[in-house]
């Protein structure tokens, strides 16, 4: 297997024998309230509730109209009166819920479920064919893409930036093949995740004074229910930094894949990028940072996720970096600027939870990889030459050419 879904694969999910699946009269008839590290569930009593006891792991059904679903390790059960039970519990370990998991899923995210970060997002609209400067409309319809306009943000302590991000609907592939029969010794045969998405971003950077500023902003997320209790969260960040004043724009068609298969860990990334209208007086970068977290269960509450059993998290820093050097001359052209622009891509696995944490603790495998950098092997690399604000033909330096000719004439005269 190479991390690709087999359409003929039969998914198998086996729970531990002591796990109790709780049925409710109506799926939406329970409430969840976070209490520190615990969750409080208020649920109507019925004959299915007799098995809910301290120490028991229970599975609650998916709530109607949402993708919220919980697994809970019960700490206490209280009769609250009025026909209601109050259950306080914590998130169980994956080995306390599942005995065997062998599932392969592939699904495109529904961007109508995109949840923006209202602190930084001014507006969200549908992506359509009328957009200027965007070249992904041929494959992206209004139903599955979003344009996110950002509020003006502070960039470090030296200035501000504003801009926009175009997000197509990402396609997620997930494969989990694991055995938790021996709870203290889990066997991971394969954990693979793949994220395919297009990003077009533009940032306007305005500085009140020269200096260095940087900002990482959380733009928003979209959750996709893959089935069998398995979810994928695609989270979008932008990393913006600059020294001086810059306008940065790029488009990226990107696929990132992380696979752990029978003791072998692989990271793959396929990027096709382009930049239009990019200019800079000094240095800057605009990196899209898509993150893909694969999890079982979870409950979104006030833009926070509770009760999730995380399997794997993959994040990438992808986008353009640019360097500029300026030289002032005493004759025309007065100012020569060399602009060095290159695509950068790195991908890594989150080692705080799930398979990433397990690999960190049990292997010496490198879990971060730089795919593209500023070297000759990078196809997304270019150099531009400007003189007094205008790009020269063939990016040649006319000042240097004049100097070479003058020196040649001088040598002939002297010689």
Segments and roles (model prediction):
Residues 14, 23, 51-81:
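Ser/Thr/Gly-rich low-complexity blocks that favor extended beta-strand/coil architectures
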Residues 47-65, 95-118:
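Extended Gly/Ser/Thr-rich low-complexity repeat segments
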Residues 78-92:
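Short, solvent-exposed secondary-structure boundary/capping segments
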Residues 101-131, 135-143, 160-164, 415:
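Extracellular, luminal, or virion-exposed ectodomains of exported proteins
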Residues 143-401:
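Membrane-lipid interaction segments
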Residues 394-415:
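Short, low-complexity, Pro/Ser/Thr/Gly-rich segments in the mature regions of secreted, periplasmic
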């Amino acid at each position: 297997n190479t991390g690709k879904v087999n359409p003929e694969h039969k998914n198998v999910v086996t729970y531990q024998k002591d796990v109790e699946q709780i049925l409710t009269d109506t799926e939406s008839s329970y409430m969840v309230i976070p209490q520190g590290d615990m969750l409080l569930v208020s649920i109507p009593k019925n004959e299915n509730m007799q098995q809910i006891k301290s120490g028991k792991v229970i599975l609650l059904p998916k709530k109607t109209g949402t993708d919220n679903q919980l697994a809970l390790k019960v700490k206490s059960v209280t009769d609250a009166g009025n026909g209601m039970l109050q259950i306080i519990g914590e998130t169980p370990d994956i080995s306390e819920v599942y005995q065997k998991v062998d599932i392969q899923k592939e699904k495109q995210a529904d961007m109508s479920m995109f949840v923006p970060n209202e602190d930084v997002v001014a507006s969200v609209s549908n992506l359509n064919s009328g957009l200027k400067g965007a070249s992904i409309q041929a494959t992206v319809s209004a139903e599955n893409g979003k344009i996110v306009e950002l509020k003006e943000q502070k960039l470090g302590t030296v200035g501000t930036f504003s801009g926009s991000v175009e997000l197509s609907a990402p396609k997620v592939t997930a494969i989990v093949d694991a055995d938790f029969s021996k709870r203290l010794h889990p066997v991971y045969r394969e954990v693979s995740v793949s994220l395919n998405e297009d990003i077009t971003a533009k940032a306007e950077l305005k500085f009140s004074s020269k200096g260095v500023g940087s900002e990482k902003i959380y733009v928003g997320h979209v959750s996709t229910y893959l089935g069998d209790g398995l979810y994928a969260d695609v989270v979008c960040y932008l990393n913006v930094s600059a020294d001086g004043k810059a306008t940065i724009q790029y488009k990226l068609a990107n696929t990132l894949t992380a696979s752990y298969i029978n003791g072998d860990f692989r990271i793959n990334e396929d990027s096709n990028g382009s930049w239009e209208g990019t200019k800079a007086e000094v240095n800057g970068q605009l990196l899209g940072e898509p993150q893909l977290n694969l999890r079982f269960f979870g409950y979104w509450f006030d833009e926070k996720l509770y009760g999730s059993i995380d399997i794997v998290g993959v994040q990438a820093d992808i986008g353009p970096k640019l360097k500029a050097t300026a030289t002032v001359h005493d004759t025309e052209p007065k100012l020569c600027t060399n602009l060095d622009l290159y695509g950068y891509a790195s991908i890594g696995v989150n080692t705080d939870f799930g398979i990433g944490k397990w690999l960190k603790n049990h292997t010496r495998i490198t879990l971060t990889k730089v795919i593209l950098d500023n070297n000759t092997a990078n196809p997304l690399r270019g150099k531009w030459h400007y003189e007094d604000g205008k790009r020269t033909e063939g990016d040649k330096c006319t000042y240097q050419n004049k100097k070479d000719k003058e020196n040649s004439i001088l040598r002939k005269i002297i010689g």
